[in-house]
């Protein structure tokens, strides 16, 4: 459950693996109003260059995230919302979305808990993050 919280996923999710992949930067975008992948801050308003299709996708995603039968936290700022009650900061990892038609190369696929244990071991952190 802790990993689900860290990644800002709905509590009822049933994920059991994680996939690592490579993609060109121009094949990715961030789920923010300005969707740039090269800066470190998200603007709160759409830039003039935002296309109608992107604005529609963004607004649809907001509706689904907040107002569906299974709402879940979406920051809209390019990082996940870590909804664990015991964390001092609710800022999770950065979010990137693969653009439709982008080429990706799968580097590895592993069980989620195997990955979690390895990360915990490498960072000398106790499970629970």
Label for each model-derived stretch:
Residues 4-129:
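Conserved NAD+-utilizing ADP-ribose enzyme module
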């Amino acid at each position: 459950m802790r990993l689900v919280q860290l990644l800002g996923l709905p509590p009822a999710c049933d994920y059991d693996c994680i996939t690592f992949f490579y993609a060109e930067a121009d094949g990715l975008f961030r789920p923010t109003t300005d969707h740039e992948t090269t800066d470190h801050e998200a603007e709160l308003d759409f830039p003039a260059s935002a296309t109608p299709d992107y604005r529609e996708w963004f607004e649809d995603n907001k509706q689904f995230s907040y107002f569906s039968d299974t709402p879940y936290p979406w920051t809209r700022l390019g990082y996940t919302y870590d909804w664990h009650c015991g964390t001092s900061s609710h800022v999770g990892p950065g979010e990137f979305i693969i653009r439709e038609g982008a080429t990706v190369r799968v580097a590895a696929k592993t069980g989620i808990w195997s990955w979690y244990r390895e990360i915990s071991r490498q960072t000398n952190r106790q499970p629970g993050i």
